[in-house]
């Protein structure tokens, strides 16, 4: 956040705040200017590790380029200030004239080629406080950071987990486990077992990607070459595996929430897919009949972005929404900065993504669980390792306010000073049906992540799974 704020501030300083796209499409620009001016490059350099000279060089290279695209990814939105980071990333694209431009950032077309503006909010009342979700999506993403709290308070008494493993993916594993055990019923629907499934009252086996027909909806409006494709099932489901739609259809009927006439097993859910496809004058039947069941969509010019994507009545981009003020994001940002200054000498743990582990999906793949990847090493650069008198392969204790764990040191100068890293997804030791994963589980780094109402980001309700202050200590004896 502070690096992006400094970069935006420097670019505005160099350009004299002259931004043609802002003049045409922007509003509340002065509030953006005020926010970034509080975090100039020289001020934040010791927190970001990026000098004012480097920020200036990056700014000048962006301004000199014919075009530039800006991208943030998963680790940023999990670091406690994802909303502001993504906002500043979009503002960077806007003020440099790279939004809606070839070579810059734009939105490809899709078979549903449009956006729905926010229409009010849905409020969910809980024992902890009220959660507000923008419509039309509504409460589709309840925050995992307070799952244990909601279970302990009695707000959640039954839980159905679909293709997930909250025991590992949510912070404070021990507390999450105790909470899940208090549920009246826990059901897991998945294609293979997991630690969470082991705790479940029922494990329901679902079909895999070869056993079901499909139209990929998720990539819509995210493809550089936009297309839509229908794929038939390749093989019949084995054993007692069932399609997810069938499982929920059956549950709804047995709970008397719908009648068999409303939700019969001859309805495979494709009428809902057809409703999406109809926006592009497409249908599942049409896709079945074309070669390869694939239709390429006509791509529009990137400059069509503003006409297609601005759905506010005034057709303007709010450069600094009032909601950021009212939700306390800016006050929180200042508090985070003060915390970073106070913890300047403390190490920060970030989550690592490698080809050997992705979201826990590769826990049971033998060839990916060899050597140091059989465990979940703590990566640290040699400067920090020397300060702590650590050597390659040494076992250390890593502690945060939320918990502690043991990890094996792996020295890597790919990391900057002040930062250590561990992979997300390890720790399936309790999944007894996964031979490799249970024998070589590695350690779950999310044990160090905080939970509870104060740990999640306002607006997004995102958990803080990265940028966690930690201390590392040598193990003198195993009694330590």
Predicted regions and their residues:
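Extended redox/cofactor-interaction regions of prokaryotic respiratory oxidoreductases
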Residues: 1-6, 90-198, 208-221, 226, ...
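Long, well-ordered, tryptophan-enriched scaffold segments
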Residues: 1-65
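Flexible, glycine/charged-enriched surface loops at secondary-structure junctions
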Residues: 17-22, 69, 100-107, 259-269
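A glycine-rich phosphate-binding loop feature that marks nucleotide/adenosyl-phosphate handling sites
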Residues: 25-27, 62, 105-116, 264-281, ...
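Flexible glycine/proline-enriched surface loops and loop-helix/loop-strand junctions
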Residues: 39-41, 71-76, 227-236
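Conserved short loop/turn motifs at secondary-structure junctions
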Residues: 46-50, 73-80, 164-168
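Catalytic, metal-anchored helix/loop core of enzyme active sites in primary metabolism
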Residues: 201
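Long, contiguous, secondary-structure-rich segments that constitute the structural scaffold
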Residues: 232-290, 365-379, 383-480
């Amino acid at each position: 956040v502070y690096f992006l704020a400094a970069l935006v501030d420097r670019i505005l300083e160099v350009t004299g705040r002259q931004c043609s796209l802002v003049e045409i499409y922007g509003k509340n620009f002065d509030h953006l200017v005020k926010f970034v001016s509080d975090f100039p490059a020289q001020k934040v350099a010791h927190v970001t590790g990026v000098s004012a000279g480097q920020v200036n060089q990056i700014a000048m290279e962006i301004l000199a380029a014919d075009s530039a695209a800006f991208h943030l990814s998963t680790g940023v939105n999990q670091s406690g200030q994802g909303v502001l980071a993504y906002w500043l990333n979009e503002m960077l694209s806007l003020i440099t004239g790279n939004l809606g431009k070839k070579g810059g950032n734009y939105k490809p077309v899709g078979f549903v080629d449009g956006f729905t503006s926010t229409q009010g909010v849905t409020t969910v009342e809980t024992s902890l406080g009220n959660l507000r979700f923008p419509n039309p999506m509504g409460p589709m993403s309840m925050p995992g950071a307070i799952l244990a709290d909601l279970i302990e308070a009695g707000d959640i008494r039954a839980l159905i987990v679909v293709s997930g493993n909250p025991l590992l993916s949510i912070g404070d594993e021990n507390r999450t486990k105790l909470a899940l055990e208090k549920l009246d019923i826990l059901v897991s629907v998945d294609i293979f077992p997991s630690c969470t499934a082991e705790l479940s009252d029922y494990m329901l086996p679902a079909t895999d990607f070869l056993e079901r027909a499909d139209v990929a909806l998720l990539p819509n409006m995210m493809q550089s070459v936009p297309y839509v494709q229908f794929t038939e099932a390749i093989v019949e489901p084995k054993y007692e595996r069932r399609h997810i739609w069938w499982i929920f259809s059956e549950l709804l009927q047995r709970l008397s929430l719908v009648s068999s006439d409303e939700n019969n097993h001859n309805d495979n859910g494709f009428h809902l897919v057809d409703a999406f496809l109809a926006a592009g004058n497409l249908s599942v039947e049409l896709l079945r009949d074309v070669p390869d069941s694939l239709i390429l969509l006509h791509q529009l010019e990137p400059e069509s972005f503003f006409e297609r994507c601005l759905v506010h009545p005034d057709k303007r981009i709010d450069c600094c929404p009032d909601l950021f003020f009212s939700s306390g994001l800016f006050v929180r940002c200042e508090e985070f900065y003060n915390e970073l200054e106070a913890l300047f000498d403390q190490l920060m743990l970030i989550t690592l993504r490698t080809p050997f582990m992705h979201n826990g999906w590769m826990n049971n793949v033998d060839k990916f669980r060899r050597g140091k990847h059989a465990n979940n090493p703590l990566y640290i650069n040699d400067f920090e390792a020397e300060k702590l008198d650590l050597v390659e392969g040494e076992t250390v204790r890593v502690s945060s306010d939320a918990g502690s764990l043991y990890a094996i040191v792996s020295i890597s100068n790919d990391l900057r000073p002040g930062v250590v890293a561990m992979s997300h997804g390890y720790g399936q030791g309790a999944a007894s049906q996964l031979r490799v994963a249970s024998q070589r589980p590695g350690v779950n780094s999310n044990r160090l992540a905080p939970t509870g109402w104060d740990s999640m980001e306002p607006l997004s309700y995102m958990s803080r799974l990265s940028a966690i202050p930690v201390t590392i200590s040598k193990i003198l004896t195993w009694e330590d």
